[in-house]
UniProtKB/Swiss-Prot annotation:
One of its GO terms (cellular component) is cytoplasmic stress granule. It comes from Gallus gallus (Chicken). It is found in: Nucleus; Cytoplasm, Stress granule. This is Mapk-regulated corepressor-interacting protein 1. Residues 81-96 have a biased composition (Basic and acidic residues). Its main location: nucleus. Residues 1-28, 76-96 are annotated as: Disordered. Belongs to the MCRIP family. A motif (PXDLS motif) lies at residues 79-83.
Length: 96
């Protein structure tokens, strides 16, 4: 069975201001964690905005990156559904 190439979305642009992360409720996050989450959120918002704005155009700011030589150690990698993981952790915390 041939392994399919790994693809990633690559954003080539500047960061901009955007909405901040909602209150954490009972969870406590470090300022570094909040900064990382904010950076990822803002970067992804820029990617989505650029994808919407380039619809129909031949080439835009957002390109799909395809790995030419995928790492063999990642062959069995299964992505994690972070929403599901958070939901399960929240349910486990309520049981305790």
């Amino acid at each position: 069975m041939a392994s399919s190439p790994v693809s990633r979305v690559v954003y080539n642009g500047k960061r901009s201001g955007g909405p901040r992360s909602p209150g954490a409720g009972s969870e406590i996050f470090t300022p570094a964690h909040e900064e990382n989450v904010r950076f990822i959120y803002e970067a992804w918002q820029c990617v989505e905005r650029d994808l919407r704005s380039q619809m129909g155009s031949e080439r835009g700011l957002v390109e799909e990156y395809v790995e030419k030589m995928p790492n063999p150690s990642l062959k069995a990698f299964k992505p994690v559904d972070l929403s599901d993981l958070k939901r399960r952790n929240t349910q486990d915390a309520k049981k305790s």
